[in-house]
Amino acid sequence: MTKDFYRQLDPVEEKIVPPENAIVISSEAKEATVNEKEAKQGVLSQRVMKYIGENELVDGISVRDPDYLKRFFNERRKQFSAKWDKVTNKIDDIAGRYYAREESFTSTIASLHTDPNERLIPGLLSILVASMTGSVLARRRTWLLRATMPIILGSCCFAYAMPTTFRNTMGLIHNLEMNTFPHFTERQDRVWKETKRLSTASVQYYYDAKKWLNKDVEKTGNAIKNWTGVNVK
């Protein structure tokens, strides 16, 4: 006769649950408890129990947890947790520095081109053409001209085509120089200020001399006119 797997199940008949009036005595698991005295005397079962741990009933289930295994996994878990925290902190630190640099870079690039009237793509193409022109013009010259002429023409075109962006770029380069080479930048600033002062003074001297010369020429012309009646102006 085949077994009917779909029969009506009686838990008591199948001994799944005890009868209603039955008395169930829970085992204290004394037979699985380590006896230190017998373990020291070399009783095999007690030595085995010492390694597999004492038996404990947890919700009616026999559980063994040796102390050395608990210590082992506790130490390994702590080591893994410490290493994991160290790795995650390192990753967070690297990611934070990367995002900070990315934000600094994007904000710096955005701060360079601030004038909407300056068309970026045509300006960059003009700078490229000017640099290539300088390279072509200095192709058969000395190495110094070949190295500097593209930079000079490109910079001049940059300052002419996009003056606001050029000033912002020069300010950025100056800040980078100040952070990297502060002493050199200070000397460079002093030289630049002195050069500007001399240039301004030279222009002023030129206009003063021109004004003085025009005044003297005018006086001389008036004197000749008064003496001879000839207009020499």
From Swiss-Prot:
Bilayer-crossing regions: 120-137, 142-164
Keywords of this entry: Membrane, Mitochondrion, Mitochondrion inner membrane, Transmembrane, Transmembrane helix
Topological relation to the membrane, as annotated: Multi-pass membrane protein
Major location (coarse): mitochondrion
Gene Ontology biological process terms, A to Z: cristae formation; negative regulation of protein oligomerization
Disruption phenotype: Moderate changes in the mitochondrial morphology.
Parts of the chain on the Mitochondrial matrix side: 138-141
Any single Gene Ontology cellular-component annotation: mitochondrial inner membrane
Intervals, Mitochondrial intermembrane compartment: 1-119, 165-233
Residues in coiled coil: none
Listed InterPro entries: MIC26/MIC27, Mic26_fungi
Compartments, record wording: Mitochondrion inner membrane
Assembly and binders: Component of the mitochondrial contact site and cristae organizing system (MICOS) complex, composed of at least MIC10, MIC12, MIC19, MIC26, MIC27 and MIC60. This complex was also known under the names MINOS or MitOS complex.
Miscellaneous section: Present with 5220 molecules/cell in log phase SD medium.
Functional description taken from the UniProt entry: Component of the MICOS complex, a large protein complex of the mitochondrial inner membrane that plays crucial roles in the maintenance of crista junctions, inner membrane architecture, and formation of contact sites to the outer membrane.
Family: Belongs to the apolipoprotein O/MICOS complex subunit Mic27 family. Yeast Mic26 subfamily.
Protein name stated in the entry: MICOS subunit MIC26
Organism whose genome encodes this protein: Saccharomyces cerevisiae (strain ATCC 204508 / S288c) (Baker's yeast)
